[in-house]
Swiss-Prot record:
Palmitoleoylation is required for efficient binding to frizzled receptors. Depalmitoleoylation leads to Wnt signaling pathway inhibition. PROSITE patterns: WNT1. One of its GO terms (molecular function) is cytokine activity. It comes from Danio rerio (Zebrafish). SMART domains: WNT1 (SM00097). Belongs to the Wnt family. It holds the Pfam family wnt. This is Protein Wnt-2.
């Protein structure tokens, strides 16, 4: 069975769509186009996505501005990993051929990007940047929690509105294809959307005499996106390799000893490459030139990161804060000091 996405890869422009391997324009170039021009000229969008793009230009602009945030979070989560969520400036799409393989890395990218769109749109709604959405209109009147009664007030983040739009827009093409890879993408998209909603916090303000809390006004707010990133990284670590069921309508675990995936799990079909060396077919850029930690025993160690090729050591000078003193009240003053440190970088393949 062929699990290649066959044109269902990432689309990244002002909106996060799904890239076709035939796209020649880079995503940041498309992001500079006007919304009408962008919607009419990006190849690979199906009619439903193109229609939504034209109808909601400000939404597309907000999504485009938020792309760097989820990419940055992806790169943070994998900063000590052989695959570090690197982007391909000279390729036809942002992640090169990585997304052609139905790997756990592809599963993570689909999930974190879907979560990133939900987070971006929810925040834009709460800040009044978009038409047709604002704070959550359902959070009115009174309610209770473990601390007692409170009144809804402030601006509760309307995450359900963002989830609905993200699902309709991103999933449109996958629902049209309905092949094995499309079902994988739909599953991981949903896991990403659900992850954002998992970290909604109840925040409250007290009202009363002398700071007492006789009356509380509360609202629901999204946690920092880092929590979503941390959660999805754990899901990546425990992602479940699956095969299609006999009816072609869902998944079952590839190995009997593994649990059946639930809606929160990430799923994938194909094993990942080792990402040690540059390989165009798999989308691996290799680890040559990557900084490694000589004393670590983790994934950032020179032994693991460099895949046994060895490493080079260079002496570099860096600026650090030193001789810090507390000054009443209330500041800390430090000097800038220069120190020489060893930096270890992986050798390239011979």
């Amino acid at each position: 069975m062929n699990f290649l996405p066959n044109g269902i890869c990432f689309y990244l422009s002002v909106a996060i769509c799904w890239f076709s391997s035939r796209v020649d324009a880079s995503w940041w170039y498309m992001g500079t186009l006007g919304s009408q021009v962008m919607c009419d000229n990006i190849p690979g969008l199906i009619n439903k996505q193109r229609q939504l793009c034209r109808q909601h230009p400000k939404v597309m602009q907000a999504i485009g501005a938020g792309i760097k945030n989820w990419i940055g979070e992806c790169q943070h989560q994998f900063r000590t990993h052989r695959w570090n969520c690197n982007t391909m400036a000279r390729e036809h799409n942002l992640f090169g051929r990585l997304l052609h393989r139905s790997s756990r890395e592809a599963a993570f990218v689909y999930a974190i990007s879907s979560a990133g769109m939900v987070y971006t749109l929810t925040r834009a709604c709460s800040q009044g940047e978009l038409e047709n959405c604002s704070c959550d209109p359902g959070k009115k009147g009174s309610s209770r929690d473990a601390k007692g009664a409170f009144d809804w007030g402030g601006c509760s983040d309307h995450v359900d509105h963002a989830i609905k739009f993200t699902q309709v827009f991103i999933d449109a093409k996958e629902r049209k294809e309905r092949d094995a890879r499309a079902l994988m993408n739909l599953h991981n998209n949903r896991a990403g959307r659900k992850a954002v909603k998992r970290f909604m916090n109840l925040e409250c303000k007290c009202h009363g005499v002398s700071g007492s809390c006789n009356v509380r006004t509360c609202w629901l707010a999204m946690a920092d996106f880092r929590q979503t990133g941390d959660y999805l990284r754990k899901k990546y670590n425990n992602a479940i390799q699956v095969v299609m069921n006999q009816y072609g309508t869902g998944f079952t675990s590839a190995y009997r000893m593994l649990k059946r995936p639930n809606k929160n799990d990430l799923v994938y079909f194909e094993d990942s490459p080792d990402y040690c060396i540059w390989d165009h077919e798999s989308g691996s850029v290799g680890t040559g030139g990557r900084v490694c930690n000589r004393t670590s025993r983790g994934t950032d160690s020179c032994e693991v990161m460099c895949c046994g090729r060895g490493y080079d050591t260079s002496r570099v000078s860096r600026t650090t804060k030193c001789e810090c003193k507390f000054q009443w009240c209330c500041a800390v003053h430090c000097r800038d000091c220069q120190e020489e440190v060893d930096v270890h970088t992986c050798k390239t393949q011979s």
